[in-house]
Amino acid sequence: MTQIGTPLSPTATRVLFCGSGELGKEVVIELQRLGVEVIAVDRYENAPAMQVAHRSHVINMLDGAALRAVIEAEKPDFIVPEIEAIATATLVELEAEGFTVIPTARAAQLTMNREGIRRLAAEELKLPTSPYHFADTFEAYSKAVEDLGFPCVVKPVMSSSGKGQSLLKSADDVQKAWDYAQEGGRAGKGRVIVEGFIDFDYEITLLTVRHIGGTTFCAPVGHRQEKGDYQESWQPQAMSPVALAESERVARAVTEALGGRGMFGVELFIKGDQVWFSEVSPRPHDTGLVTLISQDLSQFALHARAILGLPIPLIRQFGPSASAVILVEGQSTQTAFANLGAALAEPDTALRLFGKPEVNGQRRMGVALARDESIEAARAKATRASQAVDVKL
């Protein structure tokens, strides 16, 4: 049985977050509601989740010694990676020493690197994926492109949110896509994956939660990406029963192989009744922000319950719902958001402003949420709300 103590006392149940972005912030809020003591760690001060945690630390999370020092000092009951860019080898060591990593240190390690998770899905689990090659050099990359043909997609093996990702349509794109991939990787220059392009009808995120009572799937989330970065999402995505069953089979296989407890965002390509595995994140997913308005238990509440070993008997979905991001471009350390009355004037709308301390270039600073009678109406309403927000830099 789960027991939760008193925060800041010897009985406290402590959860430490590695990464403190907007997704972590929502999980922290859910844990705070359950009386959990929360420590937020990130590489910059005043990150969103730090603003709602009991305390925080600023370190380079790719520095294994620094990460170990914070974790040994805090002695958390649970370590929750919120981003990929972490010294995962240190998490593996800490897990072996008795710490609990959510969902598992191996899941964090495999999914930090596209190669690890792709080989697990395609080669070990024999799940359908796009054809692919890995390459370390421009020569090997050029050969991979030639082999797979156009169009194809190139991504750094270590990157997130579409950074370094390109769609190649002709030989003219080969050099510039390579250069962009080399700039966009999290660990600097290096290895890339080249994937054959799947001419899919749509892509989904199947939010899959592994909890004390088994595995539960949320209704499928449809989404629209630009340059690999999410712009809007909606739930439920209409699917054939065959495609949905196959999506659940693939998601169950991948999440079972990764093990542990928690929320997983399984990204899939769908064409008719066919399903291909794309990627998985062993944590809440940005496209799942829609669940803040579409479900009685959001993906963040589900993650919190799973972490703590609490039951998830049922997830209620409230009908057609959508999210639209509030994207800010420019430079500021004091961004302000105006015209919020107009943004929230329609019924069944909500906003989340993430409280990020600065914008330098283009950054997702918030999200608008909406429910309506149909997916089309919900998407349009969420977009109206998002566009109504007047951003002042």
Swiss-Prot record:
Binding locations of ATP: 114, 155, 160-165, 195-198, 203
Q: Which Pfam families match?
A: ATP-grasp, PurT_C, RS_preATP-grasp-like
Q: Under which pathway is this protein filed? A: Purine metabolism; IMP biosynthesis via de novo pathway; N(2)-formyl-N(1)-(5-phospho-D-ribosyl)glycinamide from N(1)-(5-phospho-D-ribosyl)glycinamide (formate route): step 1/1
Gene Ontology terms, MF aspect: ATP binding; magnesium ion binding; phosphoribosylglycinamide formyltransferase 2 activity; phosphoribosylglycinamide formyltransferase activity
Q: Which InterPro entries match?
A: ATP-grasp, ATP-grasp_carboxylate-amine, ATP_grasp_subdomain_1, PreATP-grasp_dom_sf, PurT, PurT/PurK_preATP-grasp, PurT_C
| Keyword line | ATP-binding, Ligase, Magnesium, Metal-binding, Nucleotide-binding, Purine biosynthesis
Q: Which GO terms describe its biological process?
A: 'de novo' IMP biosynthetic process
What is the reaction catalyzed? N(1)-(5-phospho-beta-D-ribosyl)glycinamide + formate + ATP = N(2)-formyl-N(1)-(5-phospho-beta-D-ribosyl)glycinamide + ADP + phosphate + H(+)
Instruction: Outline the subunit composition.
Output: Homodimer.
Family affiliation: Belongs to the PurK/PurT family.
- HAMAP family per the UniProt record, alphabetical: PurT
Tell me what this protein is called: Formate-dependent phosphoribosylglycinamide formyltransferase
Give the originating organism: Pseudomonas savastanoi pv. phaseolicola (strain 1448A / Race 6) (Pseudomonas syringae pv. phaseolicola (strain 1448A / Race 6))
- Give the encoding gene's name: purT
